[in-house]
Amino acid sequence: MGAKNPKIMIATPMYGGMCTGGYALSLLGAWQTLTSLKCETYIATLMNESLITRGRNDLARMFLERDADYLMFIDADITFPKDAIPALLLADKDVVCGVYSKKEIAWDSVSRAAQAGKSNLAEYSGSFVLNMMGAQGDHAEVDESGVIEVRHGGTGFMLIKRSVLEKLKDHVPTYRRTSFRNPETGDYTHPVVHQFFDTSIDDTGALLSEDYHFCELWRKHGGQ
């Protein structure tokens, strides 16, 4: 854990202002655990934002306006154990995420397991939000902190150190949500936002979602 009593901002894009019961109960458990560890915790939600890239960038802006040490993205439909966030903190990585499954069944994996005579087919049904490094395939060894390096991980459950965004600020475009100005003062009605999260096309021609784009951006500028 980088800071002795870290300050954490939990950020949840919440389109339509809705979350699942699993998320709500998980958040209560996490709050209790973090409080017992003397972590100062804030919760920020962004409701009724249909564009996820803009939503995540706005939440990152809110984070940078605070004095928090960590930005913890958690999607509104994620269920997680109460010690999951402390586990990420203990890993002490610049960017680290918890792996969660997609809303689909990996039938190819189930089929291979069945052909191999496996009996516990449910254990092979998950399709997870990550891409492994290079030619690692389906296997990688954990390091001393209990994590593995991946090429891409999901922002549905991702912890980011403040130093990451501070470093990237100089390498990304900025924008305003609108160009509207206050008619009385002439000031812009919305603040400048850094575009940490965007969609992009990588060098293989693959369209990257905003979380995978962020991973590529951080790796491009020396991160891991």
Give the residues covered by each predicted segment.
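Short beta-strand-to-loop acidic/aromatic patch adjacent to the donor-nucleotide binding site
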Residues: 67-79
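Short active-site alpha-helical segment characteristic of glycosyltransferases
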Residues: 214-217
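Active-site nucleotide-sugar/metal-binding loop of Leloir-type enzymes
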Residues: 57-70
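Conserved acidic residues
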Residues: 41, 69, 94
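Active-site neighborhoods of divalent-metal-dependent phosphate/nucleic-acid chemistry enzymes
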Residues: 200-209
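Residue-level detector of anion-binding/catalytic polar loops
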Residues: 77, 94, 224
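N-proximal low-complexity "stem/linker" segments adjacent to membrane-targeting elements
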Residues: 1-50, 54
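Conserved catalytic core of nucleotide-sugar-dependent glycosyltransferases
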Residues: 60, 81-199
